[in-house]
Design a protein with these regions (language model features):
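Active-site neighborhoods and metal-handling regions in enzymes and metal-associated proteins
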Residues: 1-224
Length: 224
């Protein structure tokens, strides 16, 4: 007897224009944009200066819409989550850590990318920037491997982060994307999703912090 096919969750609803090919393309363009912005960020800049120059680069690339603003965080501000705001006057140091988070819209589909970089040679900050990507890759590999819920992904992430020597920030636990605007579907957090996340609909976010020092790292990408 054939088992009934599970019903799709309302939390994975999409609009009529959505296609997985289009969202993958939007994500690829978002990564291209992120690396273009990252290339201009240098020690001595303030967050506000880096953000303004980054926005100019995005405009030159033809970006006309974001579903969330460009965020660039330096130093201790890498501990802050998306909803936190900073005055913009923090200066990037010679031995420092920083990240970019951007949410552009390309051809009606939402990209969302984030990555961390380190300046200089500070070993702890270099390791933090490296390990947040390693953590992301390990958790994505769990998702790649089979039917694992969003709950389970973030349970695993907490354990993996601790094994690497970091503390996982569970105030952010991933979210939906889709054809713009995904917010109409009220998808909630990936870490609160009790089913296996479908490809092309969810952003896996990892934010870690040093257990005692005031800095952290961030990485996010599409599960697809």
């Amino acid at each position: 007897m054939t088992e009934p096919r599970p019903q799709p969750s309302p939390r994975e609803a999409v609009g009529p224009a959505y296609s997985i090919e289009a969202i993958r393309k939007a994500q690829a363009k978002s990564w291209e944009a992120l690396h273009a912005v990252a290339a201009i960020v240098k020690p001595g800049m303030t967050e506000a200066q880096a953000t303004a120059q980054g926005q100019a680069i995005l405009a030159e690339m033809g970006l006309v819409r974001n579903w969330h603003p460009l965020l660039i965080r330096f130093g201790q501000n890498t501990l802050k989550i998306f909803s936190d705001r900073t005055p913009g006057d923090t200066v990037l140091g010679e031995d420092d850590i920083w990240f970019i988070d951007m949410g552009p819209v390309f051809e009606g589909h939402e990209g969302d990318v984030g990555a961390t970089f380190a300046t200089g040679t500070d070993p702890a900050k270099q390791a933090c920037a490296r390990d947040v990507k390693l953590l992301f890759d390990r958790i994505k590999a769990i998702w790649d491997g089979g039917k694992v819920s969003g709950y389970d992904l973030y349970d695993a992430a907490q354990a993996e982060a601790a094994a690497l020597g970091w503390v996982l920030n569970l105030d952010i636990q991933g979210h939906r994307v889709g054809d713009y605007p995904h917010s109409v579907h009220q998808g909630g957090k990936l870490g609160g999703f009790g089913q296996a996340p479908s490809p092309g609909l969810w952003i896996l976010e990892m934010q870690i912090r040093h257990p005692t020092e005031p800095f952290g790292a961030f990485y996010e990408d599409l599960l697809a």
